[in-house]
Structure formats: C-alpha cells, structure tokens
C-alpha cells in the first residue's frame, strides 16, 4: 500500500523520524523495565516469592532494589580473560537492539484517513533486515563466553550456536511465507495488508512455527540451554557481574519486547482498526497504536507465562525439534502460503 504524504510535510519527515527514533528508544527502554517487573511479579505470584510480592506497591520498588544491587556490586574480571572481548560484548548486544528499532514500526497514526506508520524509516526489505540484525546479538554472547576464559561459558556459547543455526531456518521460512502471501517484504505493508484477515487465521501453522522459533531465538524457556544453571552454573554469563550482567539481561528483555512486536505485526493484524476509527481525528491518532500495544503486551505475557509452565528441553531434543519437526512444517506452510497468495491475487 502506498502512503500519500502531503507536500508540505515532506521537508519535515527527516526531523519527525529523528524525533520518533529518540522517543522509541526511550519507550522501549521503559518497556524493558516494565517487562522485568512483569516477569518478576508473575514469578513471585506463582512461586510465592517474598521480594516482588512485598517490596512496595505491587512490588514496584523491587526494581529499585535490583538497580542498587547491580550498581554497587564490584566489577570483577576473570584472570587471563580477553579484555577486548569481555569488556565490549554489551556493545554488540545493545547495538543489535538499536539496529532493529530503526526499521520496526511501533504503531501508526491516521490523519484525515491517511496512514502514517510510527517507524524511524521504511525499507522495502525491512522484515529481512530486522531478522538479520537481530542475529547480531549472538556475537555479543560469544564475545562474553570466549573472553571469560571459562569452560562453562564456552559450552553455553556453543549451545547457543547450535540452537540459533537450527531455528533461524524455520523462522526465516515462515517470514518468507508471510511476505509471499502479502507480496511485500516491507513489514509496514504486511501489517497494513492484514485488515480483518489476520495472518494467524490464514497461516495458523506458520504462526505456530514462527512463535516456537522465536522463543528459541530469544533463548527463553524451554530453550535456555545456553545458561542452564543446573548444568552450566550460568552458562555464557557465568563470569559477568554487576552492571555488565544487568546490561546483558536488559538487552535480552528488549529483544523479547521486539519479538512480541514482530508476532503482533506479522500475524495478529498489527495496528489495523475499523475504518470509522481511522477516519476520526481523535481516535485515529490514539487507537491504532494502543491496539498494537495491547497485542504486544498479550504476547509478552504468554512468553513470560510459558517460562513457569514448561520444563527445559535437553540440547539434543532442541536440535531434533528444529531440524526434524519445525523445518518440514515451515516448508509445508510455505507451499500453503504461496498457493493461498496466488488464489488471493497477491
């Protein structure tokens, strides 16, 4: 879908996108703090933990206590650690997040019935770009593990490699399936094209494969073999402490939020709302983005809830699941998507 932009707005677009980008960074960081609180609160309610249940109203002060603890811990570095890799790994992990934010729309506003996506920039291949830069975080994990001079950290990193290689393939195929049916690799076009016909109903198998692969890609339970405490102490992050540990996990939480956005944009209809709301000067500005945020929070709660509902898989089970089950299902969904796309005239 081509967006029609009034001529007098065109010179302002770079400035508007810059401001939107700065706001997005702040919002996503605040969202990551909210995700940390949500996970701690849910886990505390499920397991009757004292901290997040009792510290402040709804456990909100637990975040302050965690921040004080992380900032005041001594910054230790293992003997014979590679300083260059060990000290700079967080740059790759957080850099991956910022690069994803450049092309990820977090909503849209409708002015006089015209749609304006809230994205820093739009690319013809934005969905592939987002998938590509999200994988950069693996370099940060390997830098931590290799630079730590610790065998448990290195084992965790190699487990991460095995998992990422196996699940990036079905993840990429399901993304291509959505793009093939829509006729575009632009994630804004994919979201806009869904209307009332969400891709979760048109491609339920693809949505399932994408969500499972995304869980594995993010390293969430039951796919957290790279940091399984019972086997590897803390895996790749064993030697990280203080704010290094905090920034590493903060990047993972931001990845979880951005992954939830991808599910909502690709399969849950994005920000699409009924036409009369889009044409309303008030609701058209607020409702579409709010509608998308509600879907993102729902996906986020499902991801967090699964952590406390499923056991961790063994690494051989993880590899079998990706190559022997999800990959054939992803290929089957691709055939279905291409056929459906031809039938619908995409």
UniProtKB/Swiss-Prot annotation:
Subunit structure: The FPO complex is composed of at least 13 different subunits. FpoA, FpoH, FpoJ, FpoK, FpoL, FpoM and FpoN proteins constitute the membrane sector of the complex.
Family that this chain belongs to: Belongs to the complex I subunit 1 family.
Enzyme class: oxidoreductase
Role played: Component of the F(420)H(2) dehydrogenase (FPO complex) which is part of the energy-conserving F(420)H(2):heterodisulfide oxidoreductase system. The membrane-bound electron transfer system of the complex plays an important role in the metabolism of methylotrophic methanogens when the organisms grow on methanol or methylamines. Catalyzes the oxidation of methanophenazine to dihydromethanophenazine. It shuttles electrons from F(420)H(2), via FAD and iron-sulfur (Fe-S) centers, to methanophenazine (an electron carrier in the membrane).
Subcellular localization(s) per the UniProt record: Cell membrane
GN (gene name): fpoH
Catalyzed reaction equations: methanophenazine + reduced coenzyme F420-(gamma-L-Glu)(n) = dihydromethanophenazine + oxidized coenzyme F420-(gamma-L-Glu)(n) + H(+)
Protein name (record): F(420)H(2) dehydrogenase subunit H
Keywords: Cell membrane, Electron transport, Membrane, Methanogenesis, Methanol utilization, Oxidoreductase, Transmembrane, Transmembrane helix, Transport
GO biological process: aerobic respiration; methanogenesis; methanol metabolic process
Organism: Methanosarcina barkeri (strain Fusaro / DSM 804)
GO cellular component, one term: plasma membrane
């Amino acid at each position: 879908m081509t967006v029609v932009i009034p001529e007098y707005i065109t010179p302002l677009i770079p400035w508007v996108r810059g401001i939107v980008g700065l706001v997005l960074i702040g919002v996503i960081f605040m969202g990551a703090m909210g995700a940390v609180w949500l996970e701690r609160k849910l886990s505390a309610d499920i397991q009757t933990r004292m901290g997040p249940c009792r510290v402040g109203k709804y456990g909100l002060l637990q975040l302050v206590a965690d921040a004080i603890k992380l900032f005041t811990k001594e910054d230790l570095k293992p003997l014979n650690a590679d300083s260059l890799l060990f000290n700079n790994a967080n740059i790759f992990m957080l850099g991956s997040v910022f690069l994803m934010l450049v092309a990820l729309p977090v909503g849209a506003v409708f002015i006089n019935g015209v749609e304006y996506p809230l994205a820093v920039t739009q690319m013809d291949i934005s969905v592939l770009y987002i998938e590509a830069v999200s994988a950069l975080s693996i370099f940060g994990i390997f830098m931590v593990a290799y630079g730590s001079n610790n065998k448990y950290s290195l084992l965790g990193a190699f487990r991460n490699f095995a998992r990422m290689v196996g699940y990036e393939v079905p993840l990429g195929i399901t993304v291509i399936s959505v793009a093939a049916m829509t006729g575009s690799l632009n994630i804004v076009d994919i979201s806009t094209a869904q209307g009332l016909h969400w891709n979760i109903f048109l491609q339920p198998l693809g949505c399932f494969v994408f969500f499972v692969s995304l869980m594995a890609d993010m390293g969430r339970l039951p796919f957290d073999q790279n940091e399984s405490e019972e086997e590897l102490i803390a895996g790749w992050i064993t030697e990280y402490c203080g704010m290094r540990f905090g920034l590493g996990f903060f990047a993972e939480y931001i990845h979880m939020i951005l992954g939830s956005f991808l599910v909502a944009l690709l399969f849950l209809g994005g920000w699409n709302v009924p036409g009369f709301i889009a044409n309303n000067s008030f609701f058209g500005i607020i409702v579409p983005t709010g509608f998308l945020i509600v879907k993102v929070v729902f996906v986020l709660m499902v991801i967090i809830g699964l952590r406390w509902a499923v056991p961790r898989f063994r690494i051989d089970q993880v590899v079998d699941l990706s190559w022997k089950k999800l990959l054939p299902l992803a290929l089957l969904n691709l055939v279905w998507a291409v056929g459906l796309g031809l039938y619908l005239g995409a």
